[in-house]
Amino acid sequence: MSSTIDLPKGDSPTLALVHPTEEEQLIQSKLNGAEWRGALSHSAYLRREATLSQQALTKEGGITYWILVDTALKNNPLDPNSGTRLPLASCETYRKKALVWRDGKLQEAVSHGIGSVFCGQHLRKRGYAQRLMAEVGKALRTHQTDEKRECLFTVLYSDIGKKFYANFGWEPFPSSHIALPASATTPAASLPTARPLYAEDLPELCRLDEALIRKSLESRPQGSKTAVALVPDVETVQWHHAREEFVGQEVHGKVPKIKGAIVGDEVGKRVWCYWTRVWYNEDVSIVKGNTMHILRLVVEDDALGSEDAQEGGGHGAAIAALLAMAQREAEEWKTEHVEVWSPSAAALAGAQILDKSARVIERDSESIASLLWYPEHEGRAADQLDWISNEKYSWC
């Protein structure tokens, strides 16, 4: 049927970006679920999406759904009696707290993370995804802003390389990680003691983390590049964990309780991280591809890259202790490896204490951190901005 539908090309003036009804959103969720459900059944995927839309991060306008439609159509030609419009392409955006330092001043801003960009196979090759992104880029400039908080940038993570989204302003930024295999083996090195973190530990740590980021930005030398950061607030972390817990319950019949690890007792001198587990395989015996992601790694006194870290002591050893616990959790929860995004020198040193072959991997096709900078500028924004704390917690 789809080959006979007379639909306009993506540059048609009759196309418009709108918010879908619940029925129209369900059309897209059913289609993209067939491609993205991973370890979940199709029905469980739909339930997960509904669950994630009601988290602290997403409820009350935290998530916005967008579809591209043809306003010239009187009904959905694929289902004329449904009362719905035909979604030509779709995405969702997540409202995020952001900080921007420029010209010596720190300001709070609204940002948005873009996810689930989708065009059904029967509607591809017509330019709909391109038109969607062009329209979304314009719409987000003023979406959910007010006189106190403007939107200066938006982000997305591309799984289709660096070129497509760059055509619409989302420039690729450095995207790297280190990976360690899951392991239940006790490290040979003598390491500090790492204690587990649980959900109730995270709100206070996230508040402290935001304060540390603010302090770091405010102390940037005059003349430094403009710097941006998405705030790693507890609402963001809880969204990742709600996703993890839903899939854990569906696939393994239980939810993970340990959310991270911490080394040290004195506030201001601790090293800690929190993580999430991602499963991709319906067959729970298959671990290939399943990943334990370190969402955020924090060194409270910010002494990354120090000499003792490079020598395997100090922060390098503390980070190794955190990663060793992550490896054990990864093994227990049937994930293949542990990933740390945008690793510091100390993070790499810590990883190499556990695995001498650990190295920084530059991504060039998947999970490419991409940012659209709205203020007027010449040349590549990626050359003029520092994206601070560009870690997995920012992904959506």
Description of each model-found segment:
Residues 30-103, 218-267:
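Active-site rim helix/loop that mediates acceptor-substrate recognition in acyltransferases
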Residues 117-119, 152-158, 338-340:
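Conserved hydrophobic beta-strand within the GNAT/NAT acetyltransferase core sheet
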Residues 2, 7-29:
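Long, serine/threonine/proline-rich intrinsically disordered regions in eukaryotic cortical polarity
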Residues 71-84, 142-149, 249-254, 260, ...:
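Intrinsically disordered, low-complexity domain-flanking/linker segments in eukaryotic proteins
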Residues 157, 163-190, 282-396:
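Active-site/acyl-donor-binding loops of N-acyltransferases
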Residues 68, 93, 119, 275-277:
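GNAT/GCN5-related N-acetyltransferase fold signature
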Residues 176-296:
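Amide-forming acyltransferase catalytic core, primarily the GNAT-like/NAT-type
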Residues 124-137, 315-319, 323:
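Glycine-rich acyl-CoA binding loop
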